[in-house]
Amino acid sequence: MGDIICCLDESGSTEGEAAAWGKAVTMTLLEIAAESRRSFALIHFAGGSSCQVDIFRPGEYTLEDKLTASETFLGGGTNFERPIREALRLMDTEGFEKADVVFITDGECELPDACRQELQAAQAAYHFTVTGILLDKGQADTDFSLKPFCRKIYQTNSLFDTNITSLIDAYR
């Protein structure tokens, strides 16, 4: 298993329960990365150029660093392109070339075709996957925005059954 890059939607539409689910999944993935001594990058994103990156290298961060990351909430609109480009930058320049990407969002956006094609080219070069976690609040058919670029999509409204186990096991 390689490192993990987690793109977390912190747009205004995720405020409340969806944001709590997103943070819970993110912090669980961080713990899994820590247990197996893998690096973890958290890309907080919202609209426009709003993006913040927290990098957690094994043994190089504190509980305070984790708390600060978990308390961050950007607010605003949603832009999928910015976090995808940031994930690709981390692969190119920060030693995350063997990382898989987890994309957590409520799905209220779409990835432009040019960016999707760039992502597909990078996937062919680096052999990574993108897993989507949809903060769906029980709404039907909200995975349309993740289908074009995510290999597998988990929905928070179904994480109470065995799907949560398969999600966690996929990154152990």
Each PLM stretch: what is its role?
Residues 1-57, 62-104, 108-111, 132-143:
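Von Willebrand factor
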Residues 17-19, 112-115:
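Conserved ATPase-coupling elements of RecA-like P-loop NTPase cores
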Residues 28-32, 86-93, 121:
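A generic secondary-structure signal
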Residues 36-38, 97, 126-130:
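Loop/turn elements at helix/coil->beta-strand transitions in domains of secreted/extracellular proteins
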Residues 54-70, 149-159:
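Acidic, Ser/Thr-rich peripheral helices and adjacent loops at domain boundaries
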Residues 79-85, 142-172:
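C-terminal helix of von Willebrand factor
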Residues 117-125:
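Mature extracellular/periplasmic domains of secretome proteins
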